Amino acid sequence: MDDFDRDVDNELEFSAKSTKNIKVHATFESMNLKTDLLKGIYGYGFEAPSAIQSRAIMQIISGKDTIAQAQSGTGKTATFSIGMLEVIDTKSKDCQALILSPTRELAQQIQSVVKHLGDYMNVHTHACIGGTHVGEDIKKLQQGQQIVSGTPGRVVDMIKRRNLATRNIKMMILDEADELMTKGFKEQIYEIYRYLPPGVQVVVVSATLSREVLEVTGKFTTDPVKILVKRDDITLEGIKQYHIQCEKEDWKFDTLCDLYDSLTITQAVIFCNTKVKVNWLTDQMKKANFTVVAMHGDMKQDERDSIMNDFRTGNSRVLISTDVWARGIDVQQVSLVINYDLPTDKENYVHRIGRSGRFGRKGVAINLVTKEDVDELRDIERFYRIRIKEMPVNVNDIM
């Protein structure tokens, strides 16, 4: 199911200023959605709209530019997917909606959510991502895809090759907008936007919306509806957060080895800041006879797919990764996240540890810190208004 966690949802508080004129819909029926879409929503396992869904879906359907802020676990993917599916004309084969995501995995996952929600609607949707054969994209697009979910590089390439016609696109969705804007996709998004018809509806969805993102999206949007979460609710409830003080960087490895038995109780993700570090740590763990798998952005797509598949099915239990994994990928069993390195970008902290409390499961996040990292840890605490306690001696007490 989409990234929905009822505990997290119940904790959400929206900024009164941003939502005061927005009607809250307590049921999907009250939205007057197409019957086939409603069947897809219930078939997918939703019973009632989440907090963000009850506010944002109807704004999207009304055609207004919309900026919706909601963290992992709130059903935000389904929010824009439902809004989009309601306005799609299934009789036309033309591309009518374009979703842009910062990672291939997220683009594929969104396509899967759209497919499931649109199960009874005969909707054609395609994931247009790098790392796959261009010929396959061209073939699929020629067959007619009403919804395209993709990464900016491949999408702009398909538009320039004239394989993706933009004249009937009525909605552009930017998912994880903060990541799209800050990780070098800004120019490609501007370029894509220039190819779209004037007056195209823009929907911006993200867990964190910095002032910079709001300024940039201001260039695309006209008088947007803003549905914003209060800043102090942005960290995930239900995640216990700890730090372990390590005398020096080299000692982090021994600390991790001591924790390994606890890691494999369920499944764990270990985050490093660079692919070099991911490869180094993976080699060290394997040399010490620990079973781990690794993933980072430089791997070929089929290799990443295979690793993700093994991890999803539980064949592998410990994944070492860079932030490429931190956004939008659902693995239900993950209940422990270890930050071997603290994230260089404070806003990525919520994306990393947000993995571990999905689907109402309580999670644990452990941060390994040296003296040099202490200031960074304090910055994270201030940013999210949280306290990251020192880890108890017996790790099993917290699992």
Swiss-Prot record:
Protein name from the UniProt record: ATP-dependent RNA helicase FAL1
Pfam families named among the record's database cross-references: DEAD, Helicase_C
GO biological process, one term: maturation of SSU-rRNA from tricistronic rRNA transcript (SSU-rRNA, 5.8S rRNA, LSU-rRNA)
Helicase ATP-binding domain mapped to chain residues: 57-227
Motif (DEAD box): 175-178
GO molecular function ontology, one term from the record: ATP binding
Domain of life: Eukaryota
Positions of the Helicase C-terminal domain: 238-399
Domain notes: The Q motif is unique to and characteristic of the DEAD box family of RNA helicases and controls ATP binding and hydrolysis.
Residues the entry annotates as binding ATP: 70-77
Cellular component GO terms, alphabetical: FAL1-SGD1 complex; nucleolus; preribosome, small subunit precursor; small-subunit processome
Group of enzyme by EC: hydrolase
Span(s) of short sequence motif Q motif: 26-54
Family per record: Belongs to the DEAD box helicase family. DDX48/FAL1 subfamily.
Predominant localisation class: nucleus
Source organism: Debaryomyces hansenii (strain ATCC 36239 / CBS 767 / BCRC 21394 / JCM 1990 / NBRC 0083 / IGC 2968)
Annotated function: ATP-dependent RNA helicase involved in 40S ribosomal subunit biogenesis. Required for the processing and cleavage of 35S pre-rRNA at sites A0, A1, and A2, leading to mature 18S rRNA.
